[in-house]
Amino acid sequence: MSALQPLIDTYLNHIASQRGLSPVTITNYQSNLAEFVALLNENKVGCWTELDGQLVRLMVKTLHKKGLKARSIATKLSALRSFLDYLVQFDILSNNPAKGIAAPKLDKPLPKNVSVDDMFQLLDIDEKDPLSIRDQCMMELMYSSGLRLSELVGINLQDIKLSAKEIMVTGKGSKQRLLPITDRAVATVKIWLKIRPEFCIKDEKALFVSKQKKRISARNVQARMEKWGLKQALPGHINPHKLRHSFATHMLESSGNLRAVQTLLGHADLATTQIYTHLDFQHLSKIYDQAHPRAKRKK
């Protein structure tokens, strides 16, 4: 038995009696702590007083390298932190070396993309009042070019070239990229530009403005898109990120060109684009059969 185990056994008996935890919960605590004991034994640590923050970070890193998901590591780290708090409480340790050490960031689930049919339904707006025209234009541009919310609100008049059907946006790290825009987006921008002067003060640079006659805020855009999602009877909530995600998925489904989608989205790393988009296996197999020279069999 490891020299580290007796204090764990004492701790498990303590929480079983004092906190009335179920046998299943106690077993989970025991299992989580056992992984740390194994790692400490590998690092020749024979006493809990030898544990420090650097070792805790090393163990977290090791678990991550072994392929454990962020949520599992967070659960194990929480169990270790509680155990070390117990050791501090009974003066075995002077401080908790796991306090303040975070698990890897939890993987954020991707938003469900909007289907092509639902996207057409969202953008098929009948209302012709100025705010509706502006909102339709914002959503058309976002879906047309896969814009981030910050990129959309940051667009200035000088950034858009309708004759060339292109727009310059400023992304993360102040990096600029030139993007194509669809004919439909060009048409809605032209309509918006005709009525825009009614909304803004003289010399306002922003393409999209609010009723306060200044650049529209990100929060305002989010609220307006959510409103249109409800009004157009779309399933689920509509938000700017979902439009960007849908653009990426639809483009990848149509082209199968991950590199091109990476460039359009402004991702520095291709891995980000791979995570950002999701295609079902059937569609990926179809792209593979069309693209791989050895997948094309002679009939």
UniProtKB/Swiss-Prot annotation:
Its main location: cytoplasm. Signal peptide: none annotated. Residues 109-289 form the Tyr recombinase domain. GO terms for molecular function: DNA binding; tyrosine-based site-specific recombinase activity. It comes from the Bacteria. The keyword Transmembrane does not apply. GO terms for biological process: cell division; chromosome segregation; DNA transposition. It holds the Pfam family Phage_int_SAM_1. PROSITE patterns: CB, TYR_RECOMBINASE. GO terms for cellular component: cytoplasm. It is found in: Cytoplasm. InterPro entries: CB, DNA_brk_join_enz, Integrase-like_cat_sf, Integrase_catalytic, Integrase_recombinase_N, Integrase_SAM-like_N, Recomb_XerC, Tyrosine_recombinase_XerC/XerD. Keywords: Cell cycle, Cell division, Chromosome partition, Cytoplasm, DNA integration, DNA recombination, DNA-binding. The active site is at R148, K172, H241, R244, H267, Y276. Residues 2-88 form the Core-binding (CB) domain. Site-specific tyrosine recombinase, which acts by catalyzing the cutting and rejoining of the recombining DNA molecules. The XerC-XerD complex is essential to convert dimers of the bacterial chromosome into monomers to permit their segregation at cell division. It also contributes to the segregational stability of plasmids. Belongs to the 'phage' integrase family. XerC subfamily. Forms a cyclic heterotetrameric complex composed of two molecules of XerC and two molecules of XerD. This is Tyrosine recombinase XerC. It comes from Psychromonas ingrahamii (strain DSM 17664 / CCUG 51855 / 37). The lineage of its organism: Bacteria, Pseudomonadati, Pseudomonadota, Gammaproteobacteria, Alteromonadales. The gene is xerC.
